[in-house]
Amino acid sequence: MEGEIIINELIDAYEADEDYQSVKGVWTWNDFGRPIFTGMRVPTRDLTTIPKANWDGVDLDLYAKFHYEGHTHLPIQGSRGCTYKCTFCSETRVFRYRKGHDIAEEILEQVDKYGITHFSFVDSLVNG
């Protein structure tokens, strides 16, 4: 379900010359050229196991065009999912969150590594 985990598994499968069908949560093609779904994944409960964004090699002035009062912002995600069950929404109904110290650690890493001092929380449900 988490794209960060799936993309790493796809890269590992590619580098090992393995079939993409071994990676759950992906649409791919079978040997006959027909689309197949490799199966559902269980949502990751512990968001601290998801790799943090690596901005190395990214021109942050070009990437982060969102400037507020002259400051470049980077996205921070503290939670995923939602506690509500709105019928019109595609957000997963499993609410998961990161511990405060994990979020603070990521912010401090971004400040130290990239000199970024402004962040935008991109959570779907900030007050969950």
What are the functions of these language-model segments?
Residues 1-43:
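Glycine-rich beta-alpha loop elements in corrinoid/cobalamin-binding modules
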Residues 4, 44, 76, 80:
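Electropositive phosphate-/nucleotide-binding environments in soluble metabolic enzymes
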Residues 53-128:
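Radical SAM [4Fe-4S] cluster-binding motif and immediate context
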